[in-house]
Amino acid sequence: MSNISSPFGQNEWLVEEMYRKFRDDPSSVDPSWHEFLVDYNPEPTGDSVLAAPASTDGPSAPAPAAPQTAQPALPAQTAPPAQTAQPARPAPQPAAAPGNGASTRPAKPATPPPAEGDELQTLRGAAAAVVKNMSASLEVPTATSVRAIPAKLLIDNRIVINNQLKRTRGGKISFTHLLGYALVQAIKKFPNMNRHYAEIDGKPTAITPAHTNLGLAIDLQGKDGKRSLVVAGIKNCETMRFAQFVTAYEDIVRRARDGKLTAEDFAGVTISLTNPGTIGTVHSVPRLMNGQGAIIGVGAMEYPAEFQGASEERIAELGIGKLITLTSTYDHRIIQGAESGDFLRTIHEMLLSDGFWDDIFRELSIPYLPIRWSTDNPDSIVDKNARVMELIAAYRNRGHLMADIDPLRLDGSRFRSHPDLEILNHGLTLWDLDRVFKVNGFAGAEYKKLRDILGLLRDAYCRHIGVEYTHILDPEQQEWLQQRVETKHVKPTVAEQKFILSKLNAAEAFETFLQTKYVGQKRFSLEGAESVIPMMDAAIDQCAEHGLDEVVIGMPHRGRLNVLANIVGKPYSQIFSEFEGNLNPAQAHGSGDVKYHLGATGVYLQMFGDNDIQVSLTANPSHLEAVDPVLEGLVRAKQDLLDHGADDQGDEKAFSVVPMMLHGDAAFAGQGVVAETLNLTHLPGYRVGGTIHIIVNNQIGFTTAPEHSRSSEYCTDVAKMIGAPIFHVNGDDPEACAWVAKLAVDFRQKFKKDVVIDMLCYRKRGHNEGDDPSMTNPAMYDVVDIKRGVRKSYTEALIGRGDISMKEAEDALRDYQGQLERVFNEVRELEKHGVGPSESVEADQMLPAGLATAVDKALLARIGDAFLALPEGFTAHPRVQPVLEKRREMAYEGKIDWAFAELLALGSLVAGGKLVRLSGQDTRRGTFSQRHSVIIDRNTGEEFTPLQLLATNPDGTPTGGKFLVYDSPLSEYAAVGFEYGYTVGNPDALVLWEAQFGDFVNGAQSIIDEFISSGEAKWGQLSNVVLLLPHGHEGQGPDHTSARIERFLQLWAEGSMTIAMPSTPSNYFHLLRRHALDGIKRPLIVFTPKSMLRNKAAVSDIKDFTEIKFRSVLEEPTYEDGIGDRGKVSRVLLTSGKLYYELVARKNKDNRDDVAIVRIEQLAPLPKRRLGETLDRYPNVREYFWVQEEPANQGAWPRFGLELPELLPDKLTGLKRISRRAMSAPSSGSSKVHAVEQQEIIDTAFA
């Protein structure tokens, strides 16, 4: 005979009721039951007992418990009441009947007759099953173990968990989730608690199930309002991690509420969990039904009775916590009391252990350390006040190390923490959470509970935004940031949330569209970093809100097309046309560039305001970060044109053009030009009132991981050197990204300083679309490949919060995709243009005829006078005063030297209304103490700039011109890039950058290669920047000799630059004026002299400034004046620069009338016509030489040796070279060797 309990246990009544309904009307029963009920036999067999619903007078699961006082909580903005009704809380099992559960049923007492007036009701169906089950339960011999467990850690860690879930994916963890999971884990150590008793073939048997199936008592309300109890099982619990357990738990409860449970859900429960604590019951002994070995009861969480009348403050002061009572009612036939007691002790220890909570926090992806159990610290409240203030300071300093900012969470085993941020390390414990401490104005309060303090600190510094600002030295800036960061963030309105979603839709749909339509084409997609689009949008919107004039964006190639489309507003048709290779040749002179380097301009209209603002994106090369100084210079030029001033006191219009710079993480940390550019931030000649830096931190540089590409904790650490606040933000939280962007703009406007936003994200594909990143970064891409995109996760969050419906989200995305598809089809139909070789841009800009660069003598005199027009009481340095007097003398009498000729050119342009900007290392005085453009008072240090007087006409009216002269930082890369950018922003200005020595210009080689020499051909970007490069062999060694003429000549093509090496002050004067006035926007490279600055032969007369213009080819004055006889010349020496003076001195010394020296003043473009005409004047020449002091492989010869014979084949086919031998360095390091070599060149020229 078998005596195995029914597989449905307490749910037998429900199965029987379902069977009756099925028998009467099969359609009234869910179809999932049909297959089971067709063969079901409702008759009980053996000793099986029907389970029945609980009395409707019993408590229901959803009913909220009595409110708790002094609810403990972990730091949170609002600590939810601990006993708010939790989802899926098991309802209490029927209360135990009196008695000890003996197996022998006592005799039934006689039933007294009903009194008159009593109402009689015969119990049938489910109610009758209750009677039968309760009577049958008396046959199970039970005993009960009871244990009181501290609930404080359970309460506090649950608050931590739910606060995090509230901010991320939503949902809530109940106490029963945690207790149920702890119960399952304890069963692994005590498998006997999972057994049950049965009689098989008349023999007592203990059955150990293969799995743990936890029964949950669920209270249900019928259509008639009556309540009933079912016990559904979570199957195979022992195999589940916590997240899986919660999912299974919620699934069972949801299906129970919806009437979707199946027969399988009721069968096989091995141990049950009941929760009479929901109605305040502290301790109960539930009945144990056949088929189970134990039922665990959970009592209410209460303070000990003797403290329930105490105040919240007194309870906190005493360190009193709530208790929760667990009972284990077990079948004493197979489970012993010690075993049950140890089982409860294990649950007790587990709920207080670090490992249990660490496991749950990891499973829920909570990046913070759980609160730890500890005993109370008896120190005085005064002593702890100081510790609390230390804790606040620690969060302000180190809170960013705990922030949840990595969307990939690659190190999932590590909690984000720091010893300074743990309350235990400050002598504080969880018992202090509800104590009140003095906080001296923190968050606008004088006193706060530690729980509230921690909640505010974690919300401010440790959620999806990490803030670094304590490195800033200015206390006002620190306080400003604290006030905004430590204040509760206002949640975006639903309209704002929908707008953010629309930007994410646009960003993702754009990338998906290109990936689908242009498979395999490089586009350096933004996938994985789409939140940068709503971030940039929010920043630009805030700039518009401040009434600013323009946002200028500089960025690398990643995401550039998306920014062009969704931020700048470049037409999709144009972008897709470029993908099709469908470029109109009429608009595509020059080499052009790849589609992800091009720039554009648009107008941004506020979505929730009435303002608009200009937005532009500058062109850039693939040289990462090279665009940084260019952008800064471009913005400074625009600001100088607007001339709103530079008010540091909050004037909204000061610095009204905003540079927004996007970076990659590896480049920001790795490229030195970033630090060079940051160093410009506060310098008077370079300040732009703050740049918004956005780092698209995809945590990889091509294939290189951060630990191999930087030595700092963050890629942003370099920005600390300028005191910029740094915000690290999780790219999976677009609302946080938008909030940070607006705060960054507000800070920039308030303090006119740079701000850095470090948006951590990931790169969905390889470095480009043809790359497989899993080859070198497999662990990262195992995570990336299964990660849900930010658009999906944000959409789910909005839907989950009820902000939008699923249909609204789908419609928005579908509309955008349809728009792209329509444009794509239109592009397919556009006129196709044939592809041919690229065309030169040289003819696009031609020198105008008849351009006059001479000036009136009176203007020269005005400029000379300006140098002695010192302010009253101004004392020039005694060594400078003679220089000033000499300049006035030169202005009237002539013999003008190089330095004054330059100042005459610049001053005359200022007088003519030009903005002139001159910068470089030591430029105000001049490397060789030659310029003295700014005079310093010997006594007071005050400054006087004579040429600025030329900005005013003699009648007192302004000319419109300005003279801006600055000493630059010790930088070439950033400094040259800045000046190039300035000319892009103000094409009409004359902008000059001077190298300290021409040798050092190679520090800016990237700018020269990528912008100066090729910007016009690649992007149609025009610049008329001037580089002044001191050059000449004078025995100062290889690093103070050469500006590398050969490199510039190699770069020159299709009129890209003018390269000159003038040899007279007046020709230099006319060269600068021609460059400023000719309307051609192309760079000018001038190789300027050093020793020649003080060469008494290298001077010019006044008439050379007032009567002639720039001459690209010069003969010796003796021939130009008609004194020399050209017919006697049999040898022509072609040369440039200061070497001319050495050659002419030797010629005069030796009386060599047979030798003529012709100077080529303009090296490129070569003046073919003028050179030909000049050489034609010497009819009897038999040999031509190119003479240079540079080595044979350097200087002009490598190009001239090829080009001159082609240019003038009749004369220069046999052109020979006289120079130093080919050398790897520019010169010898010995001045004596230099002298020998120099003399050899001169001797050879006249041999």
Curated annotation (Swiss-Prot):
Residues holding Mg(2+): 665, 698, 700
Active site: residue positions: 332
Region of interest: Disordered: 23-118
CDD domains registered for this protein in UniProt: TPP_E1_OGDC_like
Cofactor(s) listed: Mg(2+); thiamine diphosphate
Single GO cellular component term: oxoglutarate dehydrogenase complex
UniProt-recorded Gene Ontology molecular function terms: 2-hydroxy-3-oxoadipate synthase activity; 2-oxoglutarate decarboxylase activity; dihydrolipoyllysine-residue succinyltransferase activity; magnesium ion binding; oxoglutarate dehydrogenase (succinyl-transferring) activity; thiamine pyrophosphate binding
Coiled coil regions in record: 803-833
Activity regulation, short description: Alpha-ketoglutarate dehydrogenase and decarboxylase activities are inhibited by unphosphorylated GarA, and allosterically activated by acetyl-CoA, the main substrate of the TCA cycle.
Keywords carried by this UniProt record: Acyltransferase, Allosteric enzyme, Coiled coil, Decarboxylase, Lyase, Magnesium, Metal-binding, Multifunctional enzyme, Oxidoreductase, Thiamine pyrophosphate, Transferase, Tricarboxylic acid cycle
Region of interest (2-oxoglutarate dehydrogenase E1, N-terminal part), ranges: 1-41
PANTHER family hit by this protein: 2-OXOADIPATE DEHYDROGENASE COMPLEX COMPONENT E1, 2-OXOGLUTARATE DEHYDROGENASE
Protein's UniProt name: Multifunctional 2-oxoglutarate metabolism enzyme
Organism: Mycolicibacterium paratuberculosis (strain ATCC BAA-968 / K-10) (Mycobacterium paratuberculosis)
Record gene name: kgd
